[in-house]
Amino acid sequence: KTDGGSRINCVSTQDHKSVSELLELRKNQQMVFQDPTGALDPRFTVYEILAEPLENQGMKRPDIKKRVVELMKIVGLQPDHVNRFPNQFSGGQRQRIGIARALAVNPKLVVLDEPVSALDVSVQAGVINLLEELRASLGLSYLMVAHDLAVIRHASDRVAVLYPGRIVE
């Protein structure tokens, strides 16, 4: 059973004494949400969505532009589409934008909440394959929450099955 705490890179998420320590921990962990439509602000362009975490980290404008282009390429989207709004993309493309946003600050851990459940079956494999490629090329660790064990088996090295908060398998 979980005790309400967690450790990331041997650092407790509960023992932080300062805001700067908590911000540093958050920088090293990012989240990709289940519903790409709900996770992206429809008032922002893709550029603004991807630039926001970089601005929050104090990155300079020319470096932000380069990083946004790099992120678009990394997730398999056309860099010249950065001035579009989320509603101009398909569900799979929106999920790729969410993945790019999570990768913007070079996290060590990405938490994926049902990353493909809201996508068409034909698009799911492409996103799972992208996640696999990114994990290998960027040295990422994933914590994936999903109900589809086939997706979990394909995308994971280790699996824990939970039932009412307890690991049962």
Each predicted region: which residue ranges?
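Q-loop/switch helix immediately C-terminal to the Walker
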Residues: 35, 44-55
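Conserved catalytic motifs of ABC-family nucleotide-binding domains
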Residues: 106
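Conserved ABC ATPase signature
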Residues: 85-89, 93
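P-loop NTP-binding/switch modules centered on Walker-like glycine-rich loops
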Residues: 119, 123-169
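Conserved ABC ATPase "signature" region
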Residues: 55, 62-80
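ABC ATPase NBD coupling module
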Residues: 7-30, 56
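Walker B motif beta-strand of ABC-family P-loop ATPases
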Residues: 109-111
